[in-house]
Amino acid sequence: MVQKTSAWWHRPLGFVGLLVSLWLTSGCGLNRVAANRIIAAPNLQQHRMFAAWDSVWTNLLAKVTTNQPVSVMIPVGPPEASLSIMEIVPRDYHTKFVTTVTHRPDGGGSLALNWEPEPRNTFQPRGRPATIVVLHGYGMMKEAMAPWGFLLAQAGFRVLSIDLRGHGRSTGARIGFGKYETADLSQALDQLKARGLCDEQVGLLGLSYGATLALNWAARDPRVRTVVAIAPYNQPEEAIRRFADMAGGRVPTRILRGGAAAAAAKLELNWKDWSGEAGLRQLQCPVLLIGGAKDPICQPADIEALQKAAGGETKTLVLPEANHYVVGVSFKELTEPITDWFRERL
């Protein structure tokens, strides 16, 4: 049986949609209110969205395998939080994923993700399976990266998909755009290794927000041997503005800038210290940067700037027709180059 879900683009996303509503309904203190929204845990703001995604991905897991992946909760902090982490063990799940994209004349469109049975034996066992940690985008959850988890597991890797703090089933009242998350992930790796759930060294696959976090985590933890970053934003402040533009541009620039500045003050950080470039300048492990030529968030110029900032081996791959929604589910185009990259470096 084919299982399918669909998504539309050209509509407000994540905290941008919340900022839009704030702009339309509030008359004062917008910088402060916007800052609080920017750093607040998405799973505390978007209950309905997470419930809908949870239903979709739970259904996917049930169709792909009768042996449900094991999830554990790992305490991290400060600030105090617990991360929900799902293990997908290497074996043949007899599954393939097909993405169908439909474009509208107004520049919008839709995509449908199909999960289909694969009767062929596609499992590629390895001697001792290397571990790949998978990180989702802003406002998503670990189950949203399950297709990549199953594809990598079929390629012989052990996969750990993580709900970042404030996402999915993880806890934490605030997100830190890397300041909290890089420490969280290092602590989680310590505890996962102690439980026998991962190797000393790992590879990372990140999407969007998770891709930039992966670059900054790798820069701070020598146990990361390689990174595949799909559609990483470069400068956080610029990414916030671009998300607003993609949502319709209804939030004035001054509010976005003021909110971002106030958020940085609340987090006691400099946005530039947590950019994609900042991470790449510090890390030496091999990095595969993947973007879409039509992505307004991670633009081709950003991929070029990230490559120039890299201190070690770096390769880029840009899909000519992909936008920010499509690039992360371009399984036909990306499965082989991503699995080959990890095989050669783990």
Residue map of PLM features:
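An N-terminal hydrophobic leader/cap segment in hydrolases
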Residues: 28-122
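The serine-hydrolase catalytic nucleophile loop
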Residues: 138-150
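Conserved alpha/beta-hydrolase
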Residues: 152-171
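Alpha/beta-hydrolase active-site loop
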Residues: 175-196
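Hydrolase active-site cap/lid region
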Residues: 216-269
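Short beta-strand/loop motif that positions the catalytic acidic residue
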Residues: 283, 289-291, 295
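Acidic catalytic loop of the alpha/beta-hydrolase fold
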Residues: 294-298, 325
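Catalytic histidine-centered segment of alpha/beta-hydrolase-like enzymes
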Residues: 322-332
